[in-house]
């Protein structure tokens, strides 16, 4: 593992200058998309920086300079940075701890790729003073003797030195219920940018899992919100747009410092506290809790050899971190409050990963005063899981022997534990009031939601649907985007297969029976489900109780998924 650089300075004057400069430079997501082709933008999303380097090589546009420097991790002359950030300047960047001066040799090595892309060789401002002409070779000279009592002279610094970024800094745009937002978010540089393994206390930027949680978070106005395991603080920035008070916690002191920096840079008030899970907010309760906890199931043998990556490994045995979050959350939730989290869980070899995956999660939720919607969006066998997470932490930089040692040790741990698969998904909880809790919580488990990832309103609806009115006395309304597809054997009057499609919402496609199709088709908000079921029974010459038994569970699923509303 590598050693982390010091965290950015929380100097609000300098941070204010940086904010003014990035705004003035139009360093926004929209402008970045104008500077780069769709292909280069897509490559950046895959952590491939070379296409963007090719397209931005040699450009003096301030947004291009800042993109090369902070996102593509290319050295820049201090003068170029001062032109891009005229209020802060290169000296201010260095004072904030966002950049450092490097020597010509380090700069030349890092710039090899960009020069191969066609970028002109950028010289110091005064060539004659800083560059020895090739036609005038320097004569050898005798070393100068210095008095031992004399202080050593300060090392010479070039008038226009090269600088390199110490952090990733990039624009991030969001359209939320309260309007459009443009933020700038700092995080630690990744191994793709540095070519080095991650430090133990690495603070991750905005990755795919982060975006998933951001998309699925309920964005209703609340008085208070909590981000557990805040990392770079992006979840907390989003929460601040619709919560009167936001608290962000993290076990990592480094993550807390970077969250504080990002809050200051984006002029947002966030109460940042260091500590494990809910310990920093003991005795407090919130209307909304979000968490992308360090859930990767990591054995002690791997931690001992490679270190504990704080951003993904909470240090607990097996998947007990998820259990700790679920069991501890209700005490920190107001009645009616919501928890949303991403999670991994182990599935024993003795259980089917498609039909019995929820057993472990269900045991954790047993007896809690909550309703729960749990979705397993993917399932991996242990070998694929191990390979994915080793590569995530820079496995491509490992020596073959080190990679194989870590892989076999990790896989052997899963075998000893009897783990047959690892489920990956999300959990949404709603805290019950005293009367609801007396009768116990409702829980729904869904496997591999196809279509779209759920958005906040989809999650809110799914949780609310667990407390839907008595089905048979309820008049349901079919969503306007629901369509039906029927498959027939040639010459047959009855369909062999009926598939119901959802255009919006979760975008699901669900096989249904003829009876379910008939009920959905007749659900226009006028007749109750009981009345429609009786009509279907009469038309098909089937007992009404048999029709009810056939349609009850599928209708509850269709309600939860948004095909039907009440």
Where do the protein language model's features map onto the residues?
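Acidic, low-complexity/disordered tracts enriched in E/D and polar residues
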Residues: 2-65, 159-165, 170, 193, ...
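Long, charge-rich, low-complexity alpha-helical segments
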Residues: 62-114, 153-168, 214, 231, ...
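Non-catalytic substrate-recognition/targeting regions of SAM-dependent transferases
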Residues: 77-78, 83-120, 128-202
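Class I S-adenosylmethionine
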Residues: 181-217, 495-497, 509-514
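Conserved SAM/SAH cofactor-binding pocket of Class I
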Residues: 199, 207-291, 298
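Conserved Class I SAM-dependent methyltransferase catalytic core
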Residues: 251-252, 317-376
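Mobile active-site "lid"/loop adjacent to the S-adenosyl-L-methionine
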Residues: 253, 293-324
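Flexible, glycine-/basic-rich loop-and-beta segments that form/coincide
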Residues: 382-466
């Amino acid at each position: 593992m590598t050693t982390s650089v010091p965290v950015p300075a929380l100097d609000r004057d300098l941070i204010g200058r940086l904010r003014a400069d990035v705004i003035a430079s139009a360093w926004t997501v929209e402008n970045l998309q104008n500077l780069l082709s769709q292909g280069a933008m897509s490559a950046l999303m895959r952590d491939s920086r070379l296409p963007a380097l090719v397209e931005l090589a040699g450009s003096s546009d301030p947004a291009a300079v800042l993109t090369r420097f902070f996102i593509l991790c290319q050295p820049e002359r201090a003068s170029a940075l001062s032109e891009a950030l005229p209020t802060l300047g290169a000296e201010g960047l260095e004072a904030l701890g966002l950049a450092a001066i490097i020597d010509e040799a380090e700069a030349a090595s890092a710039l090899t790729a960009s020069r191969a892309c066609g970028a002109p060789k950028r010289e110091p401002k005064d060539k004659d003073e800083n560059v020895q002409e090739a036609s005038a070779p320097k004569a050898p000279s005798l070393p100068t003797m210095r008095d031992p009592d004399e202080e050593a002279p300060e090392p010479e610094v070039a008038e226009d030195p090269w600088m390199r970024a110490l952090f990733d800094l990039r624009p991030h745009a969001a359209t939320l219920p309260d309007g459009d937002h443009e933020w700038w978010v700092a995080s630690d540089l990744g191994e793709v940018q540095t070519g080095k393994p991650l430090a133990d206390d690495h603070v991750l930027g905005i990755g795919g899992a982060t975006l998933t949680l951001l998309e699925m978070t309920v964005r209703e106005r609340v008085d208070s919100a909590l981000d557990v395991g805040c990392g770079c603080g992006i979840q907390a920035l989003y929460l601040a747009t619709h919560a009167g008070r936001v608290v962000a916690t993290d076990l990592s002191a480094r993550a807390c410092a970077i969250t504080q920096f990002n809050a200051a840079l984006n002029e947002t008030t966030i109460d940042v506290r260091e500590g494990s899970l809910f310990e920093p907010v003991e005795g407090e309760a919130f209307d909304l809790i979000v968490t992308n906890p360090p859930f990767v199931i990591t054995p002690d043998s791997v931690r001992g050899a490679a270190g504990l990556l704080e951003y993904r490994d909470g240090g607990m045995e097996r998947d007990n971190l998820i259990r700790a979050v679920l069991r501890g959350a209700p005490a920190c939730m107001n009645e009616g409050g919501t928890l949303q989290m991403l999670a991994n869980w182990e599935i024993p070899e003795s259980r089917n990963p498609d039909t019995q995956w929820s057993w472990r999660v269900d045991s954790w939720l047993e007896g809690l005063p909550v309703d729960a919607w749990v979705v397993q969006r993917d399932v991996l066998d242990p070998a694929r899981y191990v390979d994915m997470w080793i590569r995530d932490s820079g496995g491509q930089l490992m020596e073959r022997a080190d990679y194989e040692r870590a892989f076999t040790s990790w896989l052997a741990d899963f075998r000893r534990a009897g783990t047959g698969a690892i489920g990956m998904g999300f959990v949404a909880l709603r805290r019950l009031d005293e009367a609801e809790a007396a009768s116990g919580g409702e829980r729904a488990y869904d496997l591999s939601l196809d279509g779209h990832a759920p958005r906040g309103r989809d999650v809110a609806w799914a949780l609310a649907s667990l407390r839907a009115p008595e089905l048979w006395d309820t008049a349901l309304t079919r969503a306007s985007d629901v369509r039906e597809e029927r498959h027939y054997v040639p010459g047959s009057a009855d369909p062999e297969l009926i598939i119901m499609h959802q255009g919006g919402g979760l975008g699901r496609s669900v096989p249904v029976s003829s009876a379910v199709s008939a009920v959905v088709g007749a659900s226009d908000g006028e007749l109750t489900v009981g009345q429609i079921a009786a009509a279907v029974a009469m038309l098909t010459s089937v007992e009404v109780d048999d029709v009810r038994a056939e349609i009850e569970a599928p209708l509850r699923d269709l309600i939860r998924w948004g095909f039907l509303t009440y």
